[in-house]
Design a protein with these regions (language model features):
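Canonical P-loop GTPase G-domain recognition
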Residues: 42-99, 105-121
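Helix-rich effector regions associated with P-loop NTPase G domains
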Residues: 1-9, 13-25, 30-34, 40, ...
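Short amphipathic alpha-helical patches
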Residues: 103, 107, 168-171
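A structural signal for isolated positions on well-ordered beta-strands in alpha/beta enzyme cores
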Residues: 10, 34-35, 66, 92
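Conserved long hydrophobic alpha-helices within structured protein cores
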Residues: 101-102, 143
């Protein structure tokens, strides 16, 4: 439907959990794409927008990249002005569930003196069909149903627990040095252990209230009945789709256990 039209696409991606899957959507589109990295307010202020744009430039050829926080109204006006400048009469707004699509649309409505009444939710399928939203005589948004990723943690975690794990405020990274045969446990969801001969430095970017427990891994059976994934990485990010990510500093030989290994992906280091 979208490719059959000549309308441009505003594609929203959650900055925290950028992945190959989320960026592969761009390859399926023949339209002009404005790539919008959302939820900027969750990352530390020390992370510059220019750094995020540089990171994206190494992953996609898209030149129109915007970094926004709809909640804080950072970058939204800039994007709106660009759409008007380019004479975009009508654009599709697309994105995965929890990408911040509805919050973004509500902010544009309010900027144009209208009530922001689009339903926002962290759960899939809030929008069931395409909705035309006229901002003004110059621009109409076509709100589309959110994509539901088969790799999202949402698919494997109890709904009420999942909602409690979603970050709502600036994330304070938690740094751990893990010795060989030690591990970090994230609730009943995730276990990561160091099999390297050297110490491993891991930086966790998750909701601040999430408790991380460090303990010995030898003879510890916690989560060992779950899906297992072994990785050897160097200066990479390990993403838990929809929840956050772990930055691996230097080389690491790691074993992970989680509810479903689809939840885990590895990407080039973002920060």
């Amino acid at each position: 439907m979208i490719n059959d039209s000549k309308k441009s696409v505003v594609y929203l991606v959650d900055t925290l959990t950028i992945s190959k899957e989320s960026l592969s959507v761009i390859d399926s589109l023949s339209n002009k794409v404005y790539l919008v990295l959302t939820k900027r307010d969750l990352l530390p202020k020390s992370v510059k927008n220019s750094k995020l744009k540089e990171y994206i430039s190494n992953l996609t050829l898209i030149k129109d990249v915007f970094v926004i926080s709809a909640l804080k109204n950072n970058g939204v006006t800039e994007l709106y002005n660009e759409l008007i400048k380019n004479n975009e009469k009508s654009v599709y707004v697309i994105g995965y569930t929890s990408s911040g699509k509805s919050t973004f649309i509500n902010k544009l409505l309010m900027l144009n003196g209208k009530s922001g009444n689009i339903t926002t939710s962290s759960l899939p399928n809030t929008t069931l069909e395409c909705i035309n939203i006229k901002l003004n005589d110059k621009l109409t948004l076509i709100d589309t149903p959110g994509f539901v990723s088969e790799n999202s943690s949402y698919n494997f975690i109890d709904v009420d627990i999942y909602k409690k794990l979603l970050p709502k405020s600036v994330i304070k990274p938690k740094v751990y040095t893990i010795k060989k045969n030690f591990m970090i446990i994230l609730g009943d969801i995730f276990r990561i252990e160091n099999n390297s001969n050297e110490d491993v430095n891991l930086v966790f970017y998750f909701k601040n209230e999430i408790k991380l427990n460090k303990m010995r891994s030898i003879r510890n059976k916690l989560l060992k009945d779950k899906d297992k994934l072994d990785v050897k990485v160097s200066d990479k990010d390990i993403v838990l789709e929809g929840l956050g990510y772990i930055k691996v500093v230097g080389y690491a030989n790691l074993t992970m256990y989680t509810l479903n290994k689809k939840m885990i992906s590895v990407r080039n280091k973002m920060i």
